[in-house]
Amino acid sequence: MAQIKIYGLHDHLNRHRDAISDAIHASAMAALGLPEEKRFHRFCGLDSADFIFPSDRSRRYTIIEVSMFEGRTVETKKDFIRQVFAALADRCGIEPQDVEITIMETPRHNWGIRGVPADELTLTYKVDV
């Protein structure tokens, strides 16, 4: 399970929403082993007054926050990050200089999903990869 928030300027996200979502989810499937149907993305478009960033970033500056179950190896998470950078550049023209990715891991017992704590769910995919 991964819940992903994507922050950027309204106009940028509106133009590239589908491509960004596809790039991130393809990377999550390849690196993290998420199933195709487990796409949980929230786009948070901001006005320029509400999204302040350094001058060495362009108007394509995009912040990606990933909340997911703990259990994946350091190498798996690094692979995911690298794949997201590459996919956003290839599919969306968003250069790595304009992307920041943060991963926050949470024990499954701290998630509630479909009426139960997540550590009581039977998953259709592996987390310990």
Task: State where each predicted segment sits.
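Interaction-mediating elements
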Residues: 1-129
